[in-house]
Amino acid sequence: MNKLRKLFVVIFSSLALVIASFSTAFSKVEGDTITLGAAVSLTGKYATNGEHTQRGYDLAVKVINDRGGVKIGNKNYKLAVKYYDDESDAKIAAALAQRLIEQDGIQYMLGPYGSGITIAIAPVTEKFKVPMIEANGASRALFTKGYKYLFAVLNSADQYLNSAVDLMAEQAKAAGKNLQM
């Protein structure tokens, strides 16, 4: 299984736990399907990454559904995703998140591509108490607001290089060099 596939299985495993813990009483459930919402950049400057995000979400949904879906109580549910194109625009993304929640009845969100757009959507999902699994936002600002309904699978960006810097310092010390920071 390649790294991308593993990442999205982790994302959706996390989502499955969130869904199971919040119950289906308030979710968009039609028959045996739980519909998730996502405002993703399919056009605009983030389109390439948004398309990768959408394909990753679709792959994860397929893998989970092929394995029987998400079990809540004694019942298994398949997953589906309702997408809207946020046009790589934070304001449009926030409006679409609100539309997904208020008009489409979505109660579980998948995050968009990028920190800036996630920063715009997070207050909307918080306002409506809708859990959002964020796979592509890493800005420190996402982790310092005290969001209760935002679940991230990435570390914050300021933590990305910590282990690399530690390794570099360790190797410099082993080579007898004094690394100054």
Where are these regions (language model features)?
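Short, well-structured alpha-helical segments in soluble
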Residues: 82-83, 87-107, 169-171
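Extracytoplasmic
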Residues: 31-33, 37, 76-78, 95, ...
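Short, well-ordered beta-strand elements
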Residues: 33-41, 79-83, 179-181
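Extracytoplasmic ligand/sensor domains, especially the bilobed periplasmic-binding protein
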Residues: 91, 106-181
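Extracytoplasmic "Venus flytrap"
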Residues: 37-58, 84-91, 113-116
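Short, low-complexity disordered leader/linker segments with a strong preference
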Residues: 1-35
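Signal peptide-proximal N-terminal region
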Residues: 29, 55-80, 173-175
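Short beta-strand elements in bilobed, periplasmic/extracellular small-molecule ligand-binding domains
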Residues: 69-87, 147-149, 181
